[in-house]
Amino acid sequence: MTELPTADQIADASRTLGLAASAAELHGGLCGWLAGGGAELPAWPAAVLADASLAAPRPGDALDRLREATTAQLNDRDFGFDLVLADAGAPLPERADALFDWCRGFLGGFGLAAGAAP
């Protein structure tokens, strides 16, 4: 199975594209988008962040690897799924903020993918 890029790698790639979302929020949004029935798109940030002007990640960069690894993990019948959050050794407020960001991203991505469908 493809390994998830680190939160720092995702944040660096995110800044390169000019995205304001945290690594946790991007991963949550991608997971929500895919769980809600959204297509697995190379240009996923534009769909997940509802901004058609966003460029697609370059093939092989951290955001592209995030898409590939997340898709593989969600399809894993052995439930090999990990969240992109703050390190376990990070202070509790930082970890809580990352979990909040992930959940906010998931709900947004799921809502965008599901649209009006229940």
Q: What feature does the model see in each segment?
A:
Residues 1-103, 107-118:
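Domain-length accessory/inserted modules outside core catalytic folds
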